[in-house]
Amino acid sequence: GYQTQAIDSVGKVHTVDCDGPASINNNFTQQGSIGFPAAVMIANTWNIDMAYAFGDSIGKMADEMDVSGWYAPAMNTHRSAFGGRNFEYYSEDGVLAGNMAASAVIGAKEHGVYAYIKHFAMNDQETRRTDMLCTWANEQAMREIYFKPFEIAVKKGGTTAVMSAFSYIGPVYAAGTPELMQTVLRDEWGFRGMVISDGFSSSYFQNADQVVRAGNDACLVAFDTPETHMRVRSNAALQAMRTACHNIMYT
């Protein structure tokens, strides 16, 4: 799985995170996992107890596999019936999606597993999503539709982990948008915890200095990196990294 190393001097433990909105992906654990119904099927029940039971089962499996974090629930919006990942997103209704996700987060948390709600935000199209896909919306649409599931999962579910999106919001990379990562998520909604990017270095536009300064605390890298992606050594950059470390350890 994706890992962070232990740092004994500050009491940070080694962690392993895994992908899979409907299971614990065995590409990472090398162990079999129960596959559950797709998120859209769970949402069709309108039953938050069912969503909780799903999260609870994921948490039990993750705990048995020594998995710390789960890259899910995925909770973007069904903007079209032909959306490429509608199967792993709950609904076109942000309130329904948010309540389902919050219940799943709470269920997983019962077993010490933190759930990364994703992809924050407006990652509602697969076509060219990793190629600087600029998404435009007014503030009312953002808050009432596209942000709503995440807001509910933060406030009701108490999630301590978020995965940011590949998409651009207007002309700015979502993970590098301080108005999203800090102002809305932390200042307005009261989120405490870490934000990790979607796959990092898979797209040429991703810049570690930009995202860490914006409030995106970690970069999801699937290969060994001999040195940090952070190349700026100013006082501001160092303070941003300290803040990111604090957020990661809180999660």
Feature locations, PLM:
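Glycoside hydrolase catalytic-domain context in secreted enzymes
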Residues: G1-T251
